[in-house]
Amino acid sequence: LEAPRRQVEGGQVDYLMLDYLAEVTMSILQKQKERDPKMGYARDFIGAIESVLPGIVERGVKVIANAGGVNPRSCADALLELADRKGVRGKLALGVVTGDDLLPRLDELMAQGHALANMDTGEPLALVRDRVLSANAYIGSTPIIEALGKGANIVITGRSTDTALTMAPLRYEFGWGPTEWDKLAAGIIAGHIIECGAQCSGGN
């Protein structure tokens, strides 16, 4: 919980990126949401951002986080409640990226003839449909860029690609187009290094 505060207070920071999700995390969050419809997001995001929220607003730092898990809107609601307590709600422009949750559409997709086959075994999803806890498409950087372009200073997503959280500000700030492959490749490498935290400082 100290890392965001140290980053925000320790120097000139334009963007703070927080990555919370892994494949197994989505199933855990889905179970939480089934027990309580207001849950299903990374609640430790709210704790991590609490001490730095006034500083983020004061310094103009933008935040991008996939802390929305399987319930980005509830995560946004919790963040707005925190902003109320901190007295900064009027200074926040919050963007919420949705569209990754395909669980409600699985039966529709299979009925349209999509086998959604297991990549290793080739078996169709229908064989294990009753055991599926979550089904998410990976969202790229484009909707995050759209949120930034509309003035959002905090963007919460559901299941985005790990690199999208870094790629979005790079594309937004430097105007990289969708076919500038060398620049996009560099952004993907930067994103992978950053989202794997300790690798930024030589760890593994």
Model regions: which residues?
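Catalytic alpha/beta core domains of metabolic enzymes, predominantly
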Residues: 117-141, 145-149, 155-157, 161-192
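Metallocofactor- and cofactor-centric catalytic cores in central/energy metabolism, strongly enriched
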Residues: 1-116, 124-143, 149, 154
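Short, glycine-/Ser/Thr-/acidic-enriched flexible segments
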Residues: 21-23, 161-162, 200
